[in-house]
C-alpha cells in the first residue's frame, strides 16, 4: 500500500479556500529544492531532529539490530540494518525520532478528510493530494480516494510535477477539479509539458496549470 507522511489541516496555500492536504511518500524526481525532502523515498524511514538531540544514546541501546551507533556523541543510523521496528522512536527521551510514512486504508483516510467538511463548504475549499508525487502512487489507490471525495461533493486538487505516464492522468481526470502543476526543468521538462498540455486539452475549464 502507498504511504502518507502527513495530513495537514487548515491549509490555505494548496488551492482555493481552507483545505486538508495529504502528503504522499515517494517521488520519481529528486529535486534539490524540494519542499518536502522526507517524502522523496517510497519506503518508510526513520528521521530525527538533530538540533534537539541530547546525545543520550538510548536509541543505540534499545535497537535490537545494531542499526544505531554513537559516533562523537551523536547517533548514526545504518539504514541497511534498520528494520523499522520503532523501538528507537518509542524510547527516545526527547520524542524527536519518528518513522516517516504510514499506511491509510481508503475508508480511514476519507473519514479523516470528511471531518473538515464544514470548513470546505464555508470557504470554497476542499482536499489537496500532494507529496512527494501523488501521481506516482498506485492508480487504484488514488482513484478510489478521488471517487470517494467526488461522491461526497468535495473539491479535489492534485499537486503534481507531472512526471508520470499520461495514462495515470487519464484515469483520474473525471474526478479532479484542479491540477496544480509546478514548472520543472532538466530531463523532466518535456514530460511535464506534454502531460500538462493533454490535461488542459481534455479537461478544459476545470483544470489549471500553475
What does each model-found stretch correspond to?
Residues 1-3:
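Extreme N-terminal starter segment of soluble prokaryotic enzymes
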Residues 5-58, 75-84:
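N-terminal pre-triad scaffold of radical SAM enzymes
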Residues 7, 25, 37, 79-80, ...:
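Fold-independent oxyanion-binding glycine-rich loops
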Residues 15-16, 23-24, 41, 45-46, ...:
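N-terminal-biased segments
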Residues 21-23, 69, 128, 157:
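Short, conserved beta-strand segments within well-ordered enzyme catalytic domains
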Residues 32-39, 58-77, 87-102:
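Iron-sulfur cluster-binding cysteine motifs and their immediate structural context
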Residues 84-88, 150:
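Short, compositionally biased strand/turn segments
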Residues 107-210:
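Conserved AdoMet/S-adenosylmethionine-binding subsite of the radical SAM
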